[in-house]
Amino acid sequence: MVERTFSIIKPDAVERNLQGEVLAMIQGAGLKVVAMKMIHLTKAQAEGFYAVHRERPFFDSLTTYMCSGPVVCSVLEGENAISRYREIMGATNPANAAEGTIRKKYAVSLEANSVHGSDAPETAAFEISYFFNALEIVG
């Protein structure tokens, strides 16, 4: 089934200028970039995006980190895009990520793990609409 998912290349990867490498891995896995923008999140934007984690102990640290530098947001499209992108990303904790995944190759730590990706169709829909309107998505 062709579906869309949402991706963020996080501040640690952008700071190291890894956007090209990450996008090459994504496209190499057969996913198509149908929308993309680079932004510097405000604290309020990060808190709104990660609102589902508001009660978690890592919420403040995560939202502060996500505002620490520019990020690259994109909408990816392809067969089983959500599960395929999650496979390419690797485990949240880079120590547990499989060889050849984005997080195994590029993550610095559990928090600075280089990428974010939607985990379900409902979250993909929310996350895509949080950063993009329909006119910004081509495909």
UniProtKB/Swiss-Prot annotation:
The keyword S-adenosyl-L-methionine does not apply. Its main location: cytoplasm. Keywords: ATP-binding, Cytoplasm, Kinase, Magnesium, Metal-binding, Nucleotide metabolism, Nucleotide-binding, Phosphoprotein, Transferase. InterPro entries: NDK-like_dom, NDK-like_dom_sf, Nucleoside_diP_kinase, Nucleoside_diP_kinase_AS. GO terms for molecular function: ATP binding; metal ion binding; nucleoside diphosphate kinase activity. It is an enzyme of class 2 (transferase). It catalyses: a 2'-deoxyribonucleoside 5'-diphosphate + ATP = a 2'-deoxyribonucleoside 5'-triphosphate + ADP; a ribonucleoside 5'-diphosphate + ATP = a ribonucleoside 5'-triphosphate + ADP. Its EC number is 2.7.4.6. This is Nucleoside diphosphate kinase. It comes from Nitratidesulfovibrio vulgaris (strain ATCC 29579 / DSM 644 / CCUG 34227 / NCIMB 8303 / VKM B-1760 / Hildenborough) (Desulfovibrio vulgaris). The gene is ndk.
